């Protein structure tokens, strides 16, 4: 299904789902008729820069933008196609936006993320009214005493925290046969492109919400593929930062050597903006000391239109066989990269891995029609 057509058709028939946690003040319950649409703001594919321009001109405010995203969440996450990507909404989101609008009126703009709504994965501590559960019923009632270090950095940058996204429970570290995007607390998250398929995990909620334009930007976490896989499946830009570039303090852990949070956005520029905002040395996470002198607060300076020129890009050979439509799309993308100056190299990675005796990777595809 064409992404833009799907997003425009957010009124597909579905059964209403009550949000977990409190709905932000001034809003009726999901599915109710008590709230009129607050703005005609078109959120489809909108970027951080475009939102900032609207706030700077006075055409929009952080409050109006936040309300527009909340309306969209009501329409297609909690009703309509019911993506079920958001496990909990932040009841303080509008008041946070109000405070940031006041700062702007008083001449203070913290940076490119000032007043920008964000969703973060439910294994990242937020020291507020929301829970941090990794999607598990075992942790229902758990409220963190303070923000995770990276969440503090993002708040300092001026984001409006809309809520938490669903995930594969315990970030998929619970079973060798678990289904991506399912948690006992949040249920099953759907792919916004194919509603009877999961959006890949474990940052499934951030992937689905980002693709459906339910927030300007999202944060996921990765041990092994949990940012880049849902980003790839949902046509997003996902970055797994070098471990230590973003602090891991306050994030429910799996691996001391592989874990990190990372950006999930719809454009490379937005990913670069979010990446810089999350960096910082954290005395509680010694590995962040390795980023001293190597990190920056602005990665957008490295974005170049001719950035692919002279680069060699490997393409796994097995992806060039099978479904003809997918192969056609991949080859078209390869052609675009070649016209931008890249050299495409077909490589065989999977065969040597099989020879090493790696276990078969199992993919769980949810089929809502058959249960």
Locate each region found by the language model.
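N-terminal secretory signal peptides and thylakoid transit peptides that target proteins
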Residues: 1-14
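Gly/Ser-rich catalytic/binding loops embedded in alpha/beta enzyme cores
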Residues: 16-19, 33-224, 242, 335, ...
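C-terminal segment of classical bacterial N-terminal signal peptides
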Residues: 20-25
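Acyltransferase
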Residues: 66-67, 98, 298, 322-350, ...
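Short helix-loop capping/hinge segments that flank enzyme active sites or metal/cofactor-binding pockets
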Residues: 114-134, 297-316, 365-371
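Charged, often glycine-rich, active-site loop that binds/positions anionic groups
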Residues: 133, 176, 180-183, 356-371
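Structural signature of FAD isoalloxazine-binding scaffolds in flavoprotein oxidoreductases
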Residues: 228-233
């Amino acid at each position: 299904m064409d992404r833009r057509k799907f997003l425009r058709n957010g009124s597909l028939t579905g059964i209403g789902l009550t949000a977990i946690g409190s709905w932000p003040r001034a809003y009726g319950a999901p599915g109710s008729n008590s709230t009129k649409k607050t703005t005609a703001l078109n959120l489809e594919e909108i970027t951080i820069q475009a939102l900032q321009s609207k706030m700077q001109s006075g055409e929009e405010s952080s409050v109006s933008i936040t309300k527009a995203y909340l309306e969209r969440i009501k329409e297609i996450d909690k009703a309509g196609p019911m993506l079920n990507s958001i496990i909990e909404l932040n009841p303080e989101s509008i008041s946070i936006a109000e405070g940031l609008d006041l700062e702007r009126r008083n001449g203070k703009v913290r940076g490119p993320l000032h007043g920008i709504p964000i969703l973060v994965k439910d294994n990242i501590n937020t020291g507020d009214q929301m829970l941090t559960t990794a999607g598990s019923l075992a942790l229902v009632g758990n409220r963190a005493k303070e923000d995770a270090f990276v969440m503090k950095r993002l708040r300092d940058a001026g984001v409006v925290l809309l809520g938490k996204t669903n995930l594969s429970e315990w970030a998929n570290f619970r079973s060798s046969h678990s289904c991506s995007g399912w948690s006992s607390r949040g249920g099953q998250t759907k792919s916004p492109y194919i509603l009877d398929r999961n959006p890949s995990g474990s940052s499934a909620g951030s992937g689905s919400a980002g693709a459906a334009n339910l927030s300007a930007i999202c944060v996921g976490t990765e041990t092994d593929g949990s940012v880049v896989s849902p980003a790839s499946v949902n046509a997003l830009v996902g970055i797994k930062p070098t471990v230590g570039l973003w602090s891991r303090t306050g994030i429910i852990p799996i691996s001391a050597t592989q874990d990190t949070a990372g950006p999930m956005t719809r454009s490379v520029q937005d990913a670069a903006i979010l990446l810089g905002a999350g960096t910082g040395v954290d005395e509680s996470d010694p590995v962040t000391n390795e980023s001293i002198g190597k990190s920056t607060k602005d990665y957008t300076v490295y974005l170049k239109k001719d950035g692919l020129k002279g680069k060699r890009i490997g393409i796994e050979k097995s992806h060039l066989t099978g479904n003809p439509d997918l192969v056609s799309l991949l080859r078209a993308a390869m052609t675009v990269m070649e016209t931008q100056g890249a050299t495409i190299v077909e490589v065989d990675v999977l065969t040597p891995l099989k020879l090493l005796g790696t276990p078969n990777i199992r993919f769980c595809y949810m089929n809502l029609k058959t249960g």
